[in-house]
Amino acid sequence: MLNKTSPIPLYYQLAELIKEQIRLGEIKPGDQLQSERILSEQHAISRMTARQAIAYLTREGALVARHGLGTFVAEPKLTQDTLHLLGFTEEIMQLGGNAVSRVLEQTIVLPTARVAADLRLDTDDPVVKIVRLRLSDDVPLLLETTFVPARICPGLEHENMAAQSLYALLEQSGGLQLKRARQTLEATIANDYESRLFGVALGMPMILLEGVTCDMHERPVEYFKAIYRGDRFKFAFESERSVWLNDMPGLPRVGIVLA
């Protein structure tokens, strides 16, 4: 029930109510949402308020508008697990999805100063650059750019990276044991290239994940940069507070960096 005496806008209250109905399974992915007219009559609000709530949820990715058909509950967002070191292929398979990669670039290059520093290399040390568009059920979900020191896995530039997990390849063929990744998460928007690649609107909210993966010897073995669709992903974090406010080895940590 909406509280008309609350300072919280009615459209926002209605949007939260609809999200709760989705969360509880009262309305399911693929179900058609009630019309503006029915929602306005049901909650004794104006059609404009109902329209605002629907538009808000559509922008959030909870609803999807289908031209000439109406508004429907969107498929749930994929949860990117940051607590366990999984590649995209492993993550999607764990969720029961079908992971596909389109390799846009796979070659040996010299690293930029930023990549060289993160991988503890000189700028004349060759790295394998792999750029892949990652899809699930034919929907582009993320654009991933990866740099791996060429000496770590000889021949990586010739591997079929459209059909296999990089992490599995590094562990099985490269003999590495991956331990952890240091990552940063940042809100961004789709530029012209990304909007065309993903088939989304220019300026659509996106998520930028950057980081470095290390092996059991704390040696950097991968620098990665991934652009995720903001309407299809959410990220899972877990934090534990230290009573003494000291670092606690082995626990995931979340930090905030002000730009």
Task: Describe every region a protein language model picked out.
Residues 44, 61, 222:
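Active-site-proximal glycine-rich helix-loop-beta segment
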Residues 75-259:
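All-alpha effector-binding/dimerization core of bacterial HTH-type transcriptional repressors
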Residues 1-47, 83, 253-259:
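Extreme N-terminal segment that seeds HTH/winged-HTH DNA-binding domains in transcriptional regulators
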Residues 47-48, 58-59, 65, 83-94:
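Extended, compositionally biased flexible segments
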Residues 54-55:
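Short, hydrophobic-biased segments on the C-terminal half of alpha helices
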Residues 26-31, 58-68, 72-74:
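Beta-hairpin "wing" of winged helix-turn-helix
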